[in-house]
Amino acid sequence: DREGPIRILIGMRGDMEIQKGTARMLELCRELETEMPGKLEVKAVRNLSLADYLEELKRSHIVIDQLYSYSPATNALQTMALGRVTASGGQQEYYDYIREDSKPIFCLSPLEDEAVIKERLRSLTADKEGLRRMAENGRRLVERHNDVRDIAALFERHWQRLIKGSAYGDE
């Protein structure tokens, strides 16, 4: 929806907040929320069931996945599959590896200065049309590279090689 504040969701697990950098990102997002009254709504959720978490995700525009990541994992892929923007690892090497030109992940890096991340987030939240396009491109990326039928076929080929005694394809 284009009306109202941009909703940012940060899913947190007490045992992973430092490892994933979500506590650090929550602090940064809260600062932005204070600086942009009425324009941003930041919500942190902790230890929800998957069903409850997915409901929260569906109500959000942007989901902060993790700061300390090189490529998107399950949470980021779920976020993009549901047509939401994800902030996570999305380094160039990841896109090269999957042979993807579209870069729909708001790339986070612990090497980047927090003030720079904050300004990039501010710019992202100010451009609702850009957010919409990024969300659509994320959905398409997941469809292209993570279709369940394609992944199942990869697993099947791998297991067939194992059964034949050649896990590395040197049949």
Spell out what each predicted region is.
Residues 54, 76-81, 95-96:
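Short alpha-helical segment that forms part of, or immediately flanks, the ligand-binding pocket
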Residues 113-132, 163:
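C-terminal "capping" alpha-helix adjacent to the active site of nucleotide-linked donor transferases
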Residues 1-49:
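Conserved catalytic-core segment of nucleotide-activated headgroup transferases in glycan assembly
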Residues 58-71, 84:
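Acidic donor-binding loop of glycosyltransferase active sites
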